[in-house]
């Protein structure tokens, strides 16, 4: 594999309004850029663009996905973990015992997933039927709702 020289690599640039683009091609007067939110490509004058140092073009590309959904995607590693989060969104607060009785997760796996979800801000501790449990946060609910309407 041959790496492109730094000047030919995709980079993040922004215009005067702060809108970020992926720089695809650059000539002496204009640059071909892509808006990561829309996928639309256009030529802009070089004097309208400024390089954004320290931001990976992959991070810029990921910005096309809303923050709640990105957070959900990074915290759920497989269908089981996604399913657990969807169930918490749909069922509301559930005690740890309810979760263990309802699903095919051992206690260690369940607590591991819930710890990851808590760290990501997707679940919070709650009480269900007088017992310690968990509930989905508004962030998780928005992300799941968005995925449901987009699919």
Q: Which residues does each predicted region cover?
A:
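DNA-contacting interfaces and partner/effector-binding or oligomerization modules
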Residues: 1-65
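DNA-binding alpha-helical recognition surfaces that contact promoter or target DNA
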Residues: 86, 112, 142
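A short, conserved structural fragment
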Residues: 118-128
